[in-house]
Amino acid sequence: MESKSPKEMQVEEIITDLVTKIMEGQTSGDDLPIRLWYNLRNNQEIAAIQDYANMVSIGRLGLNDHGPVHMKTVCCNALKMLSILHTAGIQTSLEKENIGTFADSVTAVMLASLLHDSGMTIGRKGHELYSGIISYSIIEKVLSQLLPENSNILRRTIIRSIAMEGIIGHMATHPIYSIEAGIILISDGCDMTKGRARIPLEIPSKPTEGDIHKYSANSIEKVKIEQGDDRPLKIEIHMKAEVGFFQVEEVLIPKIQSSPAKNLLELYAGVDGEDMKRYI
């Protein structure tokens, strides 16, 4: 198994800070998301899957990052969104339907984000379905360790199901219905900064059909996720060149439009030094 890069360790610290702060504000005292994070952070099987997914994506297929940094960045994005929505009084689907807690939603979203691209160990086409197949037993094992009592069978089932929905739905190829899964979809689309395209661009290769994704992503300087002005969430995409609009219009917006959380956010994008364009 590869050693962790400085970037991966930096993202891990951000996740630690985010999940700790989110759960510190809860009166229930439920620390399941924090216990989950320390389990997943040190899970060698998950680390191996994430590392090999990147080997296949970058080395074999010539695509951008689909490995540990990407999956953990998606987790960061999702936690930021959950925190902002929760602070704004927006309930998750589990909360609204009175079948789960906020901690359950956070747990499911973390599981989904950290495993959503595990199917890239097999290939690009249909990888969201392969991710579901690969992730199911891992999720079941982890939840059984953290919630071992028989009285938790329903809770484990609900968390696992929401996580699976987020994993299988992250490409917008399959309908999803929960806010939690919708957050995964958008969080995945928000990982589009130039760092994600850096390694593939440094590898000599002949021009291919998917190059626009690498070059457009390389123009994205920053993605901001913050509290919105007239909606709870605001996403701002800052870029150095107009080619970055491809990422916004062809990758992120279709994911937002397929998300049950689409009415909860504003989307802005623009070239640095110019006026921002509001899309949503």
List where the protein language model places each region:
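Divalent metal-dependent phosphate-bond-processing catalytic cores, especially two-metal-ion Mg2+/Mn2+ enzymes
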Residues: 1-41, 60-65, 76-103, 115, ...
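An N-terminal, globular interaction/scaffold subdomain
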Residues: 45-51, 63-68, 72
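Histidine- and acidic-residue-rich, metal-dependent catalytic cores
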Residues: 71, 75-82, 109, 128-173, ...
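General structural signal for secondary-structure boundaries
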Residues: 67, 100-105, 152-155
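Short N-terminal signal/transit or membrane-insertion segments
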Residues: 27-52, 150-170
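Active-site-adjacent bridging/hinge elements
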Residues: 44-55, 104-112
